[in-house]
C-alpha cells in the first residue's frame, strides 16, 4: 500500500513539475496600420505569426475601406459627399458608440465635427484663413444624424462624420478579439 501511495505521489509531483515548467512561446506581428505602427505580441496557440499578421492586415483594410476620411473611396467619404446613405457594421457600431459618448458628455464629444476639422486644417486640408465658425456649426451636432434601417439619415446633407477619434480604439478591439480567437492568453 505504501508503495502504491509513493508511486502515485511521485507521478503527481512529476506531472505538476512538468506543467509548471512550460515556457510561453510568444508570437509577434508588427507593421503599419491606420497611419501609425503596431506590434501585437501574445502567447498564441492557434495561429502562426504569418496568419496573425495577415488577419490584422485584413482588419486594417476593412477599417480603412469603411471609416477613413483620408481615402476618397471609403464608405465614410462617400457618405460625407452624399453619394450613399448605406452603412456597414463598422460605421453602425461606431456611430452608436459615439452617440452614447456624446450623450454622456452632454455633446462635448461629437463625430459630426468634420466641417470644423476641415476648416481648421486638420486631416490634410488647408486651413481657412479665418474660419466662419457660425456658418459651420449649423452642420455640427450628434443629434443631426440617425440610423434607420441600416441607413444614415442626416438632418442636413452637409452634416459630415469623422471617426478618427474612435476608429483606432475600435480597430484595436477587433485585433484583440482576433488574438483571443487565435488562442492568446
Question: What is each of the regions a protein language model found here?
Answer:
Residues 4-9, 14-164, 177-180, 184-185:
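A contiguous, well-ordered beta/alpha segment that forms the leading edge of an enzyme domain
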Residues 168:
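Short, conserved phosphate/pyrophosphate- and ester-handling motifs at nucleotide-, phospho-/glycolipid
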Amino acid at each position: 500500500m505504501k508503495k502504491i501511495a509513493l508511486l502515485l505521489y511521485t507521478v503527481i509531483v512529476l506531472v505538476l513539475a512538468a506543467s509548471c515548467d512550460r515556457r510561453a512561446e510568444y508570437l509577434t506581428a508588427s507593421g503599419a496600420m491606420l497611419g501609425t505602427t503596431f506590434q501585437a505580441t501574445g502567447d498564441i496557440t492557434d495561429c502562426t505569426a504569418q496568419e496573425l499578421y495577415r488577419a490584422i492586415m485584413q482588419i486594417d483594410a476593412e477599417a480603412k475601406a469603411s471609416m477613413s476620411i483620408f481615402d476618397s473611396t471609403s464608405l465614410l467619404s462617400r457618405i460625407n459627399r452624399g453619394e450613399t446613405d448605406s452603412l456597414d457594421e463598422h460605421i453602425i457600431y461606431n456611430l452608436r458608440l459615439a452617440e452614447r459618448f456624446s450623450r454622456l458628455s452632454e455633446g462635448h464629444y461629437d463625430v459630426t465635427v468634420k466641417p470644423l476639422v476641415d476648416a481648421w486644417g486638420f486631416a490634410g486640408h488647408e486651413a481657412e484663413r479665418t474660419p466662419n465658425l457660425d456658418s459651420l456649426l449649423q452642420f455640427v451636432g450628434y443629434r443631426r444624424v440617425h440610423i434607420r434601417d441600416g441607413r444614415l439619415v442626416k438632418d442636413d446633407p452637409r452634416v459630415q462624420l469623422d471617426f478618427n477619434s474612435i476608429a483606432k480604439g475600435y480597430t484595436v478591439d477587433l485585433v484583440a478579439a482576433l488574438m483571443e480567437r487565435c488562442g492568446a492568453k
